[in-house]
Curated annotation (Swiss-Prot):
Cofactor, free-text remark: Binds 1 [4Fe-4S] cluster.
Protein name: 4-hydroxy-3-methylbut-2-en-1-yl diphosphate synthase (flavodoxin)
Task of the protein: Converts 2C-methyl-D-erythritol 2,4-cyclodiphosphate (ME-2,4cPP) into 1-hydroxy-2-methyl-2-(E)-butenyl 4-diphosphate.
Catalytic activity: (2E)-4-hydroxy-3-methylbut-2-enyl diphosphate + oxidized [flavodoxin] + H2O + 2 H(+) = 2-C-methyl-D-erythritol 2,4-cyclic diphosphate + reduced [flavodoxin]
Gene3D superfamilies: Dihydropteroate synthase-like (3.20.20.20), Sulfite Reductase Hemoprotein, domain 1 (3.30.413.10)
A GO term for molecular function: 4-hydroxy-3-methylbut-2-enyl-diphosphate synthase activity (flavodoxin)
NCBIfam families according to UniProt: ispG_gcpE, PRK00366.1
Length: 416
């Protein structure tokens, strides 16, 4: 039998640290959560509001589309508005096709952005490709900005792909078309990074990404990239989809890669429901990193799934209420109660696992199941502290949780 430690996450891959507007990506820094707006960037009010919402939800970096003159002209105004709101969030400019022109024509935009994202597959075509790529890299050097070279399988460099397909055919097709495509994605990123360095962009100013839409392709491509370079890597499954499908696909793909020690920043690309909440993707990214033990963002509320013993919905309603209140209060609690993100709360529904799970939590309650004595023992720091009874068990436990937070983490804040 293999030792238990063999199943622990592999050590983080050594990568070059990149400073993105004060947020360190790579170099052993905690994996950074980022997101992207879906507003028209020229809509300054709408974009500022969404960036603020994403940042408040926990996005440490936010990417915005810069696709035309009006968008580029809006960027410094957006940056200024955010600063006046007291929001110091790095803005990433997402450029396709005409990024070289927009950066040259709008120097205030070039200065206001914390990083440029460029796609080697559409930065330019044929004889214009290298020149337009170089123009963007030179702008990054001039303004001392990092660059993410973001390859996407949907806009892959067709010249490179054709070349590799022809070479594979000449060798008698030893690789499948899918394997050749993976190799083309990897080579596109690495060759572009090499060219950027030749132009003069420092290695600590380059982040790579290789976006695909299938789980197995993401695992393969990032494993290849990680073995061939020490560049900081941005993980993300593009076009993951809506709802549970998108969450499951992103978690399956990035969870495996992160377990291998690969990845320095992540974005969960969920398609929101019509008029849905864009911050959902930030929440999922945080939860992925937290459940895997890589970072702590918010107190954990453990709750049993329910069974025939738990015909009452009290434990479900209480768990939901506590989780909702925690998420709502976290922006204030982070400042007021340092370390509160490490809190573990248990809300269990019957006697089978309730007491044991509650003992493992910092504070937990075991609510009575069907036919059980209508009493709810509360455990604090592993010890039974008291038993709640009566119609206000839920409200009483909520008050105990708040009291526990104030006593444990409020004292820490005062000491600091």
């Amino acid at each position: 039998m293999a030792p238990a430690e063999d199943f622990d996450p592999k050590p983080r891959r050594a990568s070059v640290a990149v400073d993105v507007g004060g947020v360190i990506v790579g170099g052993g820094a905690p994996v950074v959560v980022q997101s992207m707006t879906n507003t028209d960037t020229a809509d300054i009010d709408g974009t500022v509001a969404q960036v603020a919402a994403l940042h408040k939800a926990g996005s440490e970096i936010v990417r915005i589309t810069v696709d035309r003159d009006e968008s580029a002209a809006a960027v410094p105004k957006i940056r200024d508005r955010l600063e006046r709101l007291g929001l110091d969030v790095p803005l990433i400019g997402d450029f396709h096709y005409i990024g070289h022109k927009l950066l040259a024509d709008h120097p205030a935009c070039a200065e206001a952005l914390a990083k440029y994202r460029i796609n080697p597959g559409n930065v330019g075509f044929k004889d214009k490709k290298d020149k337009q790529f170089a123009d963007i890299i030179e702008m990054a050097i001039r303004y001392d900005k990092p660059v993410r070279i973001g390859v996407n399988w949907g806009s892959l460099d067709q010249e490179l792909l054709t070349q590799l397909m022809d070479e594979n055919q000449a060798k008698g097709f030893p690789l499948s078309a899918r394997q050749v495509t993976r190799e083309a994605i990897c080579q596109s990123a690495l060759l572009s990074a090499e060219l950027a360095e030749e132009i003069g962009l420092s290695r600590n100013r380059i982040i790579l990404s290789a976006k695909v839409s299938q789980v197995q392709d993401l695992i393969a491509v990032y494993s290849m990239l990680a073995s061939r370079s020490d560049h900081a890597l941005h993980l993300g499954l593009t076009e993951a989809g809506m709802g549970s499908k998108g969450i499951v696909a992103s978690s399956a793909a990035m969870g495996y890669v992160l377990q291998q020690g690969i990845g320095d920043t992540i974005r969960v690309s969920l398609t929101p429901e019509p008029n849905g909440d864009r911050t959902r993707e930030v929440q999922v990214a945080q939860e992925l990193l937290q459940v895997m033990g890589f970072r702590q963002f918010i107190p954990v509320v453990a709750a049993c799934p329910g069974c025939g013993r738990t015909t009452s919905t009290v434990f479900q309603e209480l768990a939901q209420k506590i989780q909702s209140d925690i998420r709502k209060n976290m922006p204030v609690w982070r400042e007021k109660y340092p370390g509160v993100e490490g809190l573990n709360v248990a809300v269990m529904g019957c006697i089978v696992n309730g007491p044991g799970e509650s003992k493992h939590a910092d504070i937990g309650i075991s609510l009575p199941g069907t036919g059980e004595n209508p009493a709810a023992p509360v455990f604090i720091d592993g010890e039974k502290a008291l038993t709640l009874r009566g119609p206000k068990i839920a409200e009483d436990f909520e008050a105990l949780v708040i009291d526990y937070i104030e006593k444990r983490y409020g004292q820490r804040s005062a000491a600091e």
